[in-house]
C-alpha cells in the first residue's frame, strides 16, 4: 500500500498527461508562474540557448557566442548583468574552468576566466561566486570565493565538501569534514563560524521571498533523533526541535508549514508494550550469601530459592539492557509519534499517536492540518516472564527479535482522521468511507478543503470528491465533483483537471472552484499551472516527428490565447517572473527561439537547438 500511496503522492508534483508519450516530455517542464512584464521580454530577460552546438548568451537584447562547445552549468546574477558558466578544463578530465561574461556599456564582454581546475558545482549569491578547488597539498577541496568587481579570489576554508548559497544573502553555509563528522559552518566574509556538528540533512530554498536553509544534526539528548534548525538569509540558525524522528520535506512549501514528528513517551519505551512487573522489585534483589542460610543440617532450601530469584533477576537485567540499547540505537520503537508543524507563528502541535509513514496529506498553508491513519497502541499484553523464558531456551538475540515483533503488532489502526491545530488547540475528527489503497488525499493550498481522488477498478481514471472543513476542522460531508479524470493540479482553493476518455489522447480542461466545475479548454493533451488564471495548455500533440511538438496556449483573463504553434514539448522553459521561452518548429524543420511575457509572442533567434537558461 505504501508504494501505491507514494506513487499517488507524486502525482501532485507532476502533471500526468493523457497519453503516455506526453508524460515523459511534460514532467521536465518548469511550472508556470504569474505572467509579469512591463517592458519587452526580449530586452529584459537573460537567456542562454544552443545554436550549432555552441552556447549563445543573451543579455538585454545583446548576444554573444561562447566558442567552447563544452560550456554548461550556466548561472546568472541579474543585478550585475553577469552570466557564469564552466568549461572542461585542459588540466584534468574531471575538473572545470570557471568563466563569465557581462553586459558593459551596452555590449557583452568577451569570456573571462575566474579560475582554473575547479570542481563540478558552484553557486552565485550577491554578485559573488563560490566554488570548490582541489588542494593537492592537503588532498581535499578548498572553498573559494571570487568577487568579479575586484577580481579577487580568496580561500574561506579548507577541506570543504559542499557549499550552500542563499539568494540575496551576504552569508553562505558550507560543510567541512572533521574525520567522519560533517560540520556546518556559516561564512559572511569574515571568519567562518561553526553552526552545527554531526549534520545529517541540509536543504537550501531559493527563488522565494525569504530564502532559507533547513538542516538537521544528530540529537545530543536522544539517540536516533535529530535536532531540526532553520536559518533565514541574513539571520542565524534557530532551533525548531531537539528530538525530531522524521521530517516531511517532500510536502514542504517555503513560507508554509514544515511538518515533523517527535517521540512520545510510548514510542521510546518498550515497557509500554511489554509489561515489566519486576522493574521495582528487582532493584532490591541482591546475590544471596550462603552464610545467611546455614542451619543445623547445612544450607537451607531458602538459599536455593533466593539464588534462583537472583539469577532470574540477572536475566531480566540483561534483557532490559539489550532492549534499551536497541531502542537507543534506533533499531525499533513503537511507531506512534507526535506531529508538529513549524509555521510563521512558531511551533504548533497537530496530533498524537501518528505513524509518519501513514500520513496521507498535509495542508501546505493556513492552519496546520494532516490526514492520517490514527493509531492505537495496545500496551502491556506481553509479560517479562515470556522474554525470560525465551532467553533461557535460546539467547538474547531471539529475545530482541521477538520483542520487535510484539512492538510492531501492538500498534493497530483506529481509522482515518483529520487532525488540525485550530487557534492553538489540537482537534481530531474521523474521516471514513475511503479505500486508502485507491485514494489520493490532498488539501487545497489554504487548507480549507479536502480533495479525494479515487482510482477506478482498472486503475486508469480518477473520480474527484471534495469535503469542506468547518471552523473546527470537521469535514462537512463528501461531495462528488467529476469522473474520468486523467491529470490534475491543485490551486489555492480549487483544482484544475483534465478529463478524457480511456484510450483518447485529448480531453477537456476544467477548474473546480468549490461550487462548480468550469470548462477552460477542449481538445487538450496536457496542461501546467501555478495559479488558476495562469494556465499553460498543450494541444495538437504530434509525436511522429523526430521532436515531439504541440501548440502552446495560455489561459488568461477568462479565455484561451495561442502563444505559438508546433512548439517542442521538451524544449521550453519559464523564468521566475513567468516569461515563457520556447522553440517552435516550422514545416521545413527550422527551429526558432521565441519569448512570451503576457503580451505578444516575439521571435528572438533562429536555428536554436535548446534553451538552457531563462531568467
Language-model segments: residues:
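N-terminal Sec-pathway targeting helices
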Residues: 5-24
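An edge-strand/N-cap motif at the start of beta-rich repeat modules
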Residues: 30-67, 71-76
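Residue position within the beta-strands of beta-propeller blades
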Residues: 45-51, 83-86, 130-133, 172-176, ...
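Surface-exposed loop/turn elements that mediate protein-protein interactions on large endomembrane-trafficking
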Residues: 51-68, 92-113, 138-157, 181-196, ...
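Repeated scaffold domains used in trafficking and secretory/extracellular systems
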Residues: 69-80, 116-127, 158-169, 198-207, ...
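Solenoidal tandem-repeat scaffolds enriched in leucines and small polar residues
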Residues: 164-166, 172-185, 189, 193-239, ...
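C-terminal structured domain segments
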Residues: 570-585, 589-593
Amino acid at each position: 500500500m505504501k508504494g501505491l500511496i507514494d506513487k499517488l503522492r507524486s502525482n501532485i508534483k507532476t502533471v500526468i498527461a493523457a497519453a503516455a508519450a506526453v508524460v515523459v516530455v511534460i514532467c521536465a517542464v518548469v511550472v508556470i508562474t504569474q505572467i509579469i512584464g512591463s517592458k519587452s521580454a526580449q530586452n529584459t530577460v537573460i537567456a542562454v540557448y544552443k545554436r550549432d552546438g555552441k552556447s549563445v548568451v543573451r543579455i538585454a537584447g545583446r548576444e554573444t557566442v561562447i566558442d567552447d562547445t563544452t560550456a554548461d552549468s550556466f548561472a546568472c546574477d541579474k543585478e550585475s548583468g553577469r552570466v557564469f558558466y564552466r568549461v572542461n578544463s585542459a588540466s584534468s578530465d574531471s575538473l572545470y574552468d570557471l568563466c563569465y561574461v557581462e553586459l558593459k556599456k551596452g555590449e557583452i564582454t568577451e569570456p573571462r576566466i575566474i579560475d582554473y581546475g575547479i570542481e563540478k558545482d558552484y553557486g552565485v549569491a550577491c554578485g559573488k561566486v563560490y566554488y570548490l578547488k582541489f588542494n593537492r597539498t592537503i588532498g581535499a577541496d578548498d572553498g573559494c570565493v571570487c568577487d568579479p568587481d575586484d577580481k579577487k579570489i580568496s580561500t574561506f576554508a579548507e577541506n570543504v565538501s559542499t557549499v550552500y548559497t542563499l539568494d540575496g544573502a551576504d552569508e553562505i553555509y558550507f560543510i567541512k569534514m572533521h574525520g567522519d563528522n560533517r560540520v556546518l559552518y556559516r561564512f559572511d566574509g569574515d571568519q567562518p563560524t561553526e553552526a552545527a556538528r554531526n549534520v545529517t540533512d541540509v536543504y537550501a530554498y531559493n527563488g522565494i521571498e525569504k530564502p532559507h536553509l533547513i538542516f538537521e544534526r544528530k540529537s545530543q539528548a536522544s539517540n536516533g533523533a535529530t535536532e531540526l534548525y532553520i536559518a533565514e538569509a541574513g539571520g542565524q540558525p534557530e532551533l525548531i526541535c531537539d528530538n525530531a524522528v522524521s521530517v516531511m520535506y517532500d510536502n514542504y512549501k517555503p513560507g508554509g508549514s514544515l511538518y515533523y514528528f517527535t517521540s512520545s513517551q510510548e514510542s521510546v519505551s518498550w515497557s509500554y508494550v511489554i509489561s515489566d512487573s519486576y522493574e521495582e522489585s528487582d532493584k532490591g534483589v541482591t546475590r544471596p550469601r550462603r552464610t545467611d542460610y546455614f542451619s543445623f543440617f547445612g544450607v537451607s532450601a531458602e538459599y536455593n530459592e533466593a539464588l534462583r530469584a537472583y539469577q532470574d533477576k540477572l536475566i531480566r537485567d540483561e534483557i532490559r539492557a539489550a532492549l534499551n540499547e536497541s531502542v537507543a540505537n534506533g533499531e525499533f520503537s513503537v511507531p506512534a509519534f507526535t506531529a508538529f508543524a513549524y509555521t510563521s507563528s512558531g511551533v504548533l502541535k497537530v496530533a498524537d499517536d501518528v505513524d509518519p509513514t501513514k500520513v496521507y496529506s498535509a495542508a501546505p498553508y493556513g492552519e496546520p492540518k494532516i490526514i492520517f491513519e490514527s493509531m492505537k497502541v495496545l500496551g502491556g499484553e506481553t509479560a517479562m516472564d515470556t522474554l525470560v523464558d525465551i532467553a533461557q531456551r535460546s539467547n538474547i538475540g531471539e529475545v530482541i527479535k521477538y520483542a520487535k515483533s510484539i512492538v510492531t503488532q501492538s500498534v493497530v489502526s483506529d481509522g482515518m482522521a483529520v487532525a488540525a491545530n485550530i487557534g492553538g488547540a489540537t482537534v481530531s475528527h474521523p474521516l471514513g468511507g475511503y479505500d486508502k489503497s485507491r485514494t489520493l488525499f490532498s488539501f487545497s493550498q489554504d487548507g480549507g478543503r479536502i480533495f479525494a481522488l479515487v482510482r477506478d477498478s482498472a486503475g486508469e481514471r480518477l473520480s474527484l470528491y471534495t469535503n469542506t472543513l468547518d471552523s473546527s476542522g470537521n469535514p462537512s460531508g463528501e461531495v462528488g465533483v467529476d469522473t474520468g479524470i486523467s491529470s490534475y493540479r491543485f490551486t489555492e482553493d480549487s483544482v484544475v483537471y483534465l478529463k478524457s476518455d480511456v484510450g483518447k489522447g485529448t480531453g477537456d480542461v476544467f477548474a473546480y472552484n468549490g461550487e462548480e466545475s468550469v470548462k477552460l479548454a477542449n481538445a487538450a493533451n496536457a496542461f501546467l499551472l501555478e495559479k488558476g488564471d495562469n494556465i499553460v495548455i498543450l494541444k495538437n500533440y504530434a509525436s511522429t516527428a523526430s521532436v515531439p511538438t504541440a501548440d502552446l496556449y495560455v489561459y488568461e483573463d477568462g479565455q484561451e490565447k495561442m502563444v505559438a504553434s508546433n512548439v517542442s514539448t521538451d524544449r521550453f522553459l519559464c523564468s521566475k517572473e513567468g516569461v515563457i521561452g520556447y522553440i517552435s518548429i516550422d514545416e521545413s524543420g527550422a527551429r526558432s527561439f521565441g519569448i512570451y511575457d503576457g503580451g505578444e509572442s516575439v521571435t528572438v533567434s533562429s536555428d536554436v537547438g535548446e534553451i538552457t537558461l531563462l531568467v
